[in-house]
Structure formats: C-alpha cells, structure tokens
Amino acid sequence: MADNGNAKPGGGGSGAYTINLDNFSKRLKVFYDHWKEHNSDLWGSSNAIAIATPPPSEDLRYLKSSALDVWLLGYEFPETIIVFMHKQIHFLCSQKKANLIGTLKKAANDAVGADIVLHVKAKNDSGVGLMEDIVRAVCAQSKSDDPIVGHIAKEAPEGKLLEAWADKLSSSSVQLTDITNGFSELFAMKDTSEITCVKKASYLTSSVMKNFVVPKLEKVIDEERKVTHSSLMDETEKAILDPLKVKVKLKAENVDICYPPVFQSGGKFDLKPGASSNDDYLYYDSASVIICAIGARYGNYCSNMARTFLIDATPTQIKAYETLMKAHEAALEALKPGNRMSAVYQAAVDVIEKNAPELLRNLTKSAGTGIGLEFRESGLNLNPKNDRIIKAGMVFNVSLGLHNLQAEKKSEKTKQYSLLLADTCLVPLENLTASCSKLVKDVAYSFNDEDEVLPVKKVEVNAKEALPPTKATLRSDNQEMSKEELRRQHQAELARQKNEETARRLAGVGSGSGDGRGPSRSSNELVAYKNVNDVPYARELVIQVDQKNEAVLLPIYGSMVPFHVSTVKSVTSHQDNRTCTIRIFFNVPGMPFSNDSNLKSQGAIYLKEITFRSKDPRHSSEVVQQIKTLRRQVASRESERAERATLVTQEKLQLTSNRNKPVRLSDVWIRPAFGGRGRKLTGTLESHVNGFRYSTSRADERVDIMYGNVKHAFFQPAEKEMITLLHFHLHNHIMVGNKKTKDVQFYVEVMDVVQTLGGNRRSALDPDEIEEEQRERDRKNRINMDFQNFVNKVNDHWSQPQFKGLDLEFDVPLRELGFHGVPYKASAFIIPTSTCLVELIETPFLVVTLSEIEIVNLERVGFGTKNFDMAIVFKDFKKDVLRIDSIPSTSLDAIKEWLDTTDLKYYESRLNLNWRPILKTIIDDPQKFIDDGGWEFLNMEASDSETEETEESDQGYEPSDAEPESESEDEDSDSESLVESDEDDEDDSEEDSEEEKGKTWEELEREASNADRENGAESDSEEERRRRKVKTFSKSRPPPERSSFKGGPSKKPKFR
C-alpha cells in the first residue's frame, strides 16, 4: 500500500493504516449508483468491472487504477486486483492488505449489499488458481457464458501478477470493454473532502510561486547571476516538499509534486503539459520571456499554475500578453454549471479574434483539462470538440498559451517566444490560485535600455518596483540625453491621460463650489439647573463657582443668577490699589466663533460683559482661577465628545485564542501619547485575529486598531535616525486617549541619550568609547530585528485569504530616494515608499498616498536658485494643496525621475501659484478648464508668445501682478497667502477667543505675529516673509541652503 503516489508503504503491519469507513461507504455507493445509471453509455454495459493496480514505480505517473484505490480506500494498493460485481467484490492481494480490507466487509454490505471476497496470494504463488476462481464467480453471477467485463484498456499490464491476469481474461470466455470514460465522469465531481484537498494543494502552489519563485527570480536578475533552469527546478521542488519554507502550515508527509517544476527561457519553449526544464542558463536580457509552471499535490489531489514573466518587454509583447490574459479571464468566466466544455475554449477564441486576430494561429488547441487525483483528466478536456456539460464540483486546470510568437528583436534567444497562463479553478467560479497575480504590472520586469531613444510604450510596473534604474543598466554613452528624452515623452503621454481622466471625473461630479467644509455640529443645549429650586442657596451675595453643575453664580440686583460656564468667553481680573476688578465676557450671537446653536432666542437681549469690584483680592483671584479651570475642563470634555461623535464605528477586536499566542512587540512607545498626568509608560503591541491592540500597565491606556481601518502600514528601521518605528495611517479617525487621529505610531529609541558627567572628551580609540559604540550598534540591530520579526509575522497573517481584499503589507521607506524639505514649519527628511510619500520622524507626520495625487507642480524652478518648492494637487479639488518648501535644487533631477517612474505627471514653474482660486475656478467651470487644455496651462515649455499671453489670462489659472477683486476682506487676506490653508482661520480664532490655558510657544509666536501685522511691523520669520508675498509673480526667497540630495538612482526595479 502507498498513500503517496506509487511509492512503497512504510514498514510494519496493517495496523499502521486505517481506512475511513464513512468515506468508503459513501463513495462505494456513489460508484455503484453511477455504474447502474450510466452502464450503457459510460460503463460499456459491463456485468463486472476489473481493476488491476501495477507494482510501485519510482516514476511519477497517473493511473486510473491507482486513482480508484486512493478515491475509494484512501491508499494506493500496488499489485492488487479488484473485481466489482453487483453482489460481490473480489480482492486478490497479499495477506497484509487482506487484513486491512477485511475491515470493510460490513460497510460494503450495508452500502451496496455486496459481499467482500478475499483471495490471499502467497508470496511465491503465481495467483493463477485464484484468478480462475474469480473468473468463475463472474460467469456464475452474470448468468451468461460470455459476460462483459469492464477494464482500463490504456493501462498495459505490469509485473507477473498483472500479466497473468491479463492472459487469464483474454483466454477466458469473457468480453472486455473499455470503461475509462466511466471513471473520468466518476472522478469529475468532487465532494467536500476532495475540494478541501484541492484547495490546500492550490494554496501551496500559489504560495510557492509568490513567496519563493518570484523572489528567487528577482534576486537572480537583480544580482545578474547565472542560474540554470534545472537548478531552479530542483530548488522549487524542495520548496514544495517543505511547505514551511513558503510559510504554509501543511504536513510535509501529505505533500508531493505533480510534476518537476518547469522553467523555460531563451527562445526554447514547450507549452505541452509534459514539458521539462533543460540545463540552459536562465535568460533575462531585454525583450526576453520567462515561463514558470509548478504543481503541488496534497492528499494525492493535484493543482497547477503557470505564469509568464516579461523582461523589458516590447509593445508587441505587452499587447500579446494582455490579449492572452483577457482570453484566459474569459475562459475562467465561461466555467459555469450548464455550459458545454467547448464553450470555454470558444470564449477564449472570441477574445483573441476581437483584440488580436493575428494571434489566433498561435493559440493552444485546448484551454486545459479537469484536474484532481489525476493531473490531466482527459475526459474533461476543454477543447472545441468536447460537448460534455460542466457541473458544480468540477475542478479544472485552465491553461491557455500563445506559442511560437515572433519578436521584433532578432537576436538568437529573443526572436521567438511563447506565453503561458494557467490557474486551478473550482466550479462554480473560484480561482484557487489567484493569490499570485498575473497582471502586467505584476509580471513585467522593466527597465529602459538606453541604446534606444525611440518612443517606447511605458510598461506599467508595480509601485514597489517603480524605482529609477541604476547606471549599471544604462549602456549608452549619451545616457543623460536619452534619459531626459524618454522622460519627456512619458510625461507627454501622462499629460494626455491625466487630462482625459480629469475631464471624466469632473464631468461625473459636476460643477460646484465651496470649500468642502460641512456645517459645524450643534452641541447639546447648555443647562446648569433644570429649575429654580435647584439653584443653591447663598448666604452672601458673592461670586460663586458650582463645580458640580458647571455653573457660575453672579449676584445681580440682590439675586444669585446662574450662568453655565460654557457661556463665559473669558474672565480677567485687575487690581488697582486696594480695589480688585473682575470682568467677565460672555458669548453672544453675532460674535466671531460663538456657538449660536446654543443660543435659542436669537432676538433677545444678551449680556455681553459684566464687571464686579471687590476689596478682597484673595477671593477675586481664587474665583477667576476657578472659572478658568472649570471652563477649560468643560471645553476639553465637550471637544473630545464632539470628536468622538464624528468617529466611524469600528468592528470589535477578536482576541487570539489562548492556544495561539498573539504576536507581540514589547516595550514600545506610542504617538500620539496618552493624556493625563503621571509618568509615561511603555506598552505592548499585539496582533490579534482582526486587529492590533496596544496597552500599558494602566487599565485606561489601551488602543485597538482594526486591520480593516489600516490604509497604509510602514516599517522604518533606524538607520540615521534615533528610533525604529511602525506607523499606521488609517482610513478613519480613532481616539488615542483624548486625541482624535488618523496616524498612530509605535516606536523604540535605539540609542539612550546620555551625558558624560566628567565632561572630558574621550579619544576615538578609547576602549570605553569603542565598547559603548559597539553596545549601541548591538542594541540598534537587536531592536531592528525584533521589529522585523514582528512585521514578517503580521505580513504572514495578512496574506491569509480573509484579508486579501484589504491589500495590506508593511511598506519600508526607500531612504536612498529621500530629500529634505519643509512640509509644515520645520525642515524634515521626506522619503518615498512604494505607495506613499512620508515623513514619520517629526510631528506632525506626513503621509501622502500617491494614488490620490492629481499632479505635482515644482515651483520656483530656474537657474540660480538654490532650492525650489513642490505643490501636490490632489484628485479631490476641495482638499487643500500640500506644499513642501525649500527643497534643495540638487534633488530636482532625482525627484523628477522618481515622479516619472511612479507615473505621476509633474510640471515646472518659475513662480509660486495661489492654488485655492485656481481649484475653485476649475470646480466652478470644469468645461472651460477642459476646453483650455486642462493642466497644460502649467506647461513651462510652451512658446514665449504663449507665455506672454498667459500673463493676461484668467487669474484662476495663471499668476497675475494685480490683486483680484474680492468680495470681502477675508478673501483679500486669503489671496495674499502663497499657501491656502486653515492657519489663518486658526490665527483669527486665537485672536478673538482667549484660551485660558498655558499657551505653547507656537501659539505665543502666532499671537505676536498677529500683533506685529496689526501694527504694521515687519516680522523676520521666513513664514511671515512668505505670507507677505504677492499672490503670483513673487520674488524668489532665499531660504537656508539644505544638505544636498543624499539619494540617487536605486537598484533595478524589482521583478514581480
């Protein structure tokens, strides 16, 4: 017996094996019912069915006799003859197998009413006499002298036992009929347990392709190594046989290969199922193609997938691959219950005829076959001649290819190429190997060969691979010129696409104006006391503060009049000689930033200010302080309540069971930090079933982050920074303590801040200094490794099928592409990632999603300037333009290269633009924007005459010396600012309302700046100089020179 292919069984008696009696009974009944129902058309009107399984073999092969053994008994029974009759089932086998089969007698009788008859063959016995007994039993039960016995005609007898059996049948009076089609139909419909095995096999196959084959090819190509196809085959086979290598938790003893993995490149391609890998080196030069096909088995059930990888593909190759991919998808879509199998191939043909009819002659003659216990279930061939009906529960290997295609480049190894795609699919439609993408952007390894300066269609690559090529990949002497030419051509194509995309989006949204800010929320009605009786009795007519009811009691005309503390705008006290004056200001309708929604009677007369004089300075000071404290507490509470009210309800965190410990990262800090007094504590970050939980030793310090709320996840190890961090940018705000945020960060300081008490400088060769530096390096490496292990485990968790739609994976910022700039108020080192532009060290954090960017405008670009600015315009025109100022000019070329490789359209201008009126004009009149050429008004490369004309054009698009007419002073002040933001509103808010809490340095500086502006004074700050600039044609400011651009062209794009 063997439970894995045709291998020999392990040592020991039959007790080492057990047969699942439930499966045996159920499947035996299915077999007999099918035989009875389709005896005339599929089983050859047979009276008996004889199955002879050959001896074990070292070759990898698929036999229907072996498949029947596994399907019915759970194991393969080599050198065993089984004869099924309506009332009896005869087994001719060895004693060990007979002992195991004997346990099935009752189950067989209960299931189909058949008795199991055992014929035990001795070790040196030929078995001929036992065979005669079986033949006589067949003739006796059929009541005919020439009964019809079904057998598998294509399986030639092997070994002495099967040869003797074949001779016995041919020499007897029985008639033989081929029943191959019967077994093909029987095995086609998979039950639940079979489907589970196929799914596990498919998951292993796709995991090997995604987590082993692709990274392996990436590394080979990136390092330009010489590796043979056969060595890749051997390494991939080992990865399949050891599932833990690809992070798949399947038992290795249940796993096997369907066939040796196939790697093909260099112009030699064979798309037949029996293809093999040769000993040639993997060829990955320009315009080359690599085909990889792998298949894994689990519990003897097969799966298969094939992918084609394109290396610096030509437009013709890209078109052929896209056509094949569409045809493959059409074939998958046609796998519906009730359709004929020929319709699957026809669906693929229809796509080819529509998109590229010239490729029809290169299309493979079949779209695949059924798959299961056999790698190719021939009766389920998806070719144009098979009219069998597709049924639910069938599993197919949908394999489609284009062979012998002619390439544009006529080198020996690229003049001819082939393309192949294959996936394992369950009916109704479920692509079991879809986790490994076949999209062009994920299989194209593209770098521009600089020998050519002709227009080349841009190969869309994954953002993760969208990096500038290294000089090692540029083989032309005039590389800089051709590089700039290619970039200009690509940008022109992007401009066309961007204008079309913007026109479609504006047409769909329609015109409209406004700043996109919704109406302010109305807070609850402020009530201090529900009725007069609740007002506390006062013995003295003095100002009192009722902390419990949040009220201020004021003596007015001999009565204590209560005011809710929220109605108090500010309170001040002033002492003059022995008299102390208390002035209380109230919020009234019509005042800036007053909450009118709380003032029900808008037509009534309101108290705006009240003054009291007192000769008790101590009491006056105490009352003022109590009012300020209470007002601050209430304001903070209401603000937090209002913020919480706007939060999106999150799902509940499902904690990991006790059996499976959650992945933990200990002793980490969180930003933003929890509020409250007391010493700040580190906490533990845990990964659970559907989210993260961060908690400290304090019960009230806990944060849950759901995986579904994570928009971007970043891991930034400490290199030149002092911290190693994990950063989560969220879809919706959450509360961290009493702070509402979309960015949550967990970090550890890799270096302790210490100071030598002695104050003496130590030598660089001082042993203590060297030892301390080594300790710091070890600590940094250990922390980075702890974070890396946590990230790897979470990435593995996210790769599970239930998180497929979230598309989550930790992204690592590409430091070599970073540049210095000022995104807010201070200079920072800004770093691109595969999907974002981030700055995660300094607060406030910067996270810009690249897919949300409309265009990028590089401003103040010109000769002689030491730095320039970057204006990022988002697809949501109601969102403020993000500015990154003071970027060193030495970073300009690298930034343009990065923008181009990430398919972002950029423009250059010599001046700063005021974007708020520009976007407002676009929103108000999108048709005019489209008619005027879209974003091309930003094109600095236009003719001089056109530039002169644009100076007099609509101010909504071009800068102008003249101030635009505005309807209010507020708009005038807005138009004077280079960067439209909410800071001005915040400044006014600070000016009109006195915050009765300790002010930060930024708030004090803002108040001083406002006072200087009112008095006409000049501010020396760079921000104020920028604010005083005229909206458009402004002089270039000379900010401090930043350090030069540290990055440079990175390595080749990663191969996906």
UniProtKB/Swiss-Prot annotation:
Residues 467-524, 942-1056 are annotated as: Disordered. Residues 477-504, 996-1016 have a biased composition (Basic and acidic residues). Keywords: Chromosome, Coiled coil, DNA damage, DNA repair, DNA replication, Nucleus, Transcription, Transcription regulation. It is found in: Nucleus; Chromosome. One of its GO terms (biological process) is DNA replication. Pfam families: FACT-Spt16_Nlob (PF14826), Peptidase_M24 (PF00557), PH_SPT16 (PF24824), Rttp106-like_middle (PF08512), SPT16 (PF08644), SPT16_C (PF21091). Residues 316-336, 768-789 form a coiled coil. Component of the FACT complex, a stable heterodimer of SPT16 and SSRP. Belongs to the peptidase M24 family. SPT16 subfamily. Component of the FACT complex, a general chromatin factor that acts to reorganize nucleosomes. The FACT complex is involved in multiple processes that require DNA as a template such as mRNA elongation, DNA replication and DNA repair. During transcription elongation the FACT complex acts as a histone chaperone that both destabilizes and restores nucleosomal structure. This is FACT complex subunit SPT16. It comes from Oryza sativa subsp. japonica. The lineage of its organism: Eukaryota, Viridiplantae, Streptophyta, Embryophyta, Tracheophyta.
